[in-house]
Amino acid sequence: MNNWSIDDARASYNVNYWSQGLYGISDEGEVTVSPDPNRPDCKIGLNELAKDMVKAGVALPVLVRFPQILHHRVNSLCQAFNQAIQKYKYEADYLLVYPIKVNQQQTVVEEILASQVEKEVPQLGLEAGSKPELLAVLAMAQKASSVIICNGYKDKEYIRLALIGEKLGHKVYIVLEKMSELKVVLEQAKELGVTPRLGLRVRLAFQGKGKWQASGGEKSKFGLSAAQVLKVIELLQHEEMLDSLELLHFHLGSQIANIRDIRQGVSEAGRFYCELMKLGAQVKCFDVGGGLAVDYDGTRSQSNNSMNYGLTEYANNIVSVLTDMCKEYEQPMPRIISESGRYLTAHHAVLLTDVIGTESYKPETILPPSEDAPLLLQNMWQSWTEVSGKADQRALIEIFHDCQSDLTEVHSLFALGQLSLADRAWAEQINLRVCHELQGSMSSKYRYHRPIIDELNEKLADKFFVNFSLFQSLPDAWGIDQVFPVMPLSGLDKAPERRAVMLDITCDSDGIVDQYVDGQGIETTLPVPAWTQESPYLIGFFLVGAYQEILGDMHNLFGDTNSAVVRVDENGRRNIDSVLEGDTVADVLRYVNLEAVSFMRTYEELVNKHIVADERSNILEELQLGLKGYTYLEDFS
């Protein structure tokens, strides 16, 4: 592809769309990051960043965080709602609440809070869904608006901690998820002498579409039915505490791709709000929960990995629906709250790592079968002569199907003992040779070729063995088929010569990335430059800032990766603020109740028993260094 350009590279990886202007490809073919889209010239190359960190002693893989991206996302979301409020003349304000379950890392939470430190009236609060999260939030919420929303199932201790939060000066909303919580809240509030701020999570009939759609609808795990809502109102009236009900909450699920689903959910919840107000409640806050999606594949579609709306459209729909409904039913307009954790955090983190080796198909000269070879092998050779003889486009399809059918029969006959190992090896090689020739002869401009091209690309793809654990760093790719953009960090100024799949270093066949963002949608292979030991390059996994760290699993005892916080100044210079070392082998052993200290004693006994005296100290030192070392590969050259 002699006319390859950087624009072709950008289109091939769809980077201009999924990156939201935060990541790009330079004219030199290197992947860059611009943490502040308002200053696109202030960008740095990720390849050079990774190499410099390695020189400084930070081993790959490393998770790099860009806090300026967090700041930008917070302010963009607040700005979108502020503009919508002004546009529709909405008579209340907006508050962005960050649910820390999305990423509880202290650096992340503190940077989100710091994004509005200069605002006279911060539009930022925090959400907790468990006792540990609440205890963390109680220590941090004062850095913003001091608004805390308590979701999830609650016991007496959780509720007391939330009420204590009020005594500490926070505004803590205890959202009732089930009927039994109300009694405990009222009892503990009375005992502590605190007037509680109550919220109701309503269970909507409407259910949004997506991987997390079970979060909403009548069968939802959380929330109160219409009858239960009325019962809560009755109990609060009886206790003369109806004015404590200040918040209405609903949740359609994470990653809602269709704006119509959001609009319909807000509309139904808005009716709940108006009815509660008619019953005498003084609800002040309307919490739409999560659902604001991230366009992981950049297709701006209704797929599970995308969204068919933008930030402005999201805010406009919520504000306009509530404006119209409050006017129609003559009710005051409540403060709008959203819990948009995925949107805030996904883009800010990228995993940078190295390729430790590749396995690729290289065409070989294959001799024809002997005259007395089985007819099946003769047929496969005939397929090869036809495809190498430049068969017409429609004949190529027949050749492909014939060759695949023949190979299947070869495997069956080998299992029955009717073909030798040499016969099988020859058949597999000629099949690959035919497929390779077909791959070069078929064209995606023919619709009937496209599914076969996809199959050929997958069959002939290079295998890239990448220094990371899918289960630790991209658990959603394995667990729910989430798509994450993947790109080589350099060499993109040249046309990709290969297609590849990324395999991790765990001993598990599921440790493979099997979906890739492509300019044409989602593909099963990734276009890449040729990789060799002499001209290697690094790989980046993008949009991994939401959920992946906390959901990561220590399969094969691969632990947390190294991580770094990086900023880019107004002159385009990078500053590495901090580096957090990943887990050592001793760390991960301790997680599963294996003690490195006792292992060292055992090693000493074995060394003294089996190793000659002049080698003992070196062997022991190497074992000790192994326990102190990184869980990922460090020396594979």
Curated annotation (Swiss-Prot):
It holds the Pfam family Orn_Arg_deC_N. HAMAP family: SpeA. It comes from Shewanella piezotolerans (strain WP3 / JCM 13877). PANTHER family: ARGININE DECARBOXYLASE, BIOSYNTHETIC ARGININE DECARBOXYLASE. Belongs to the Orn/Lys/Arg decarboxylase class-II family. SpeA subfamily. The keyword Metal-binding applies. Its cofactor is Mg(2+); pyridoxal 5'-phosphate. It comes from the Bacteria. Substrate binds at F286, D287, V288, G289, G290, G291, L292, A293, V294, D295, Y296. GO terms for biological process: arginine catabolic process; putrescine biosynthetic process from arginine; spermidine biosynthetic process. InterPro entries: Ala_racemase/Decarboxylase_C, Arg_decarb_HB, Arg_decarbox_C, Arg_decrbxlase, De-COase2_N, Orn/DAP/Arg_de-COase, PLP-binding_barrel. This is Biosynthetic arginine decarboxylase. The modification N6-(pyridoxal phosphate)lysine is found at K101. It catalyses: L-arginine + H(+) = agmatine + CO2.
